[in-house]
Amino acid sequence: MCGIFSKEVLSKHVDVEYRFSAEPYIGASCSNVSVLSMLCLRAKKTI
């Protein structure tokens, strides 16, 4: 279970990094907050 969860988290980080690089016009602070909230929401849904 730990291995599967870590793989999911890793893929999500890659997805987030891709979105961030694709949208450079977004402010750093705003993107960081949205990324953190998105990761928290996704983590709660998967668990």
Swiss-Prot record:
Question: What does the record list as GO biological process?
Answer: cellular response to cell envelope stress; cellular response to heat; cellular stress response to acid chemical
Q: Which UniProt keywords apply?
A: Stress response
To which species is this protein native? Escherichia coli (strain K12)
Q: What is the lineage of its organism?
A: Bacteria, Pseudomonadati, Pseudomonadota, Gammaproteobacteria, Enterobacterales
InterPro entries given in the database record: DUF2527
**Protein family:** Belongs to the YobF/DUF2527 family.
Taxonomically, the superkingdom here is Bacteria
Give the induction note.
Expressed during stationary phase, induced at 45 degrees Celsius (at protein level), at a post-transcriptional level.
**What protein does this entry describe?**
Protein YobF
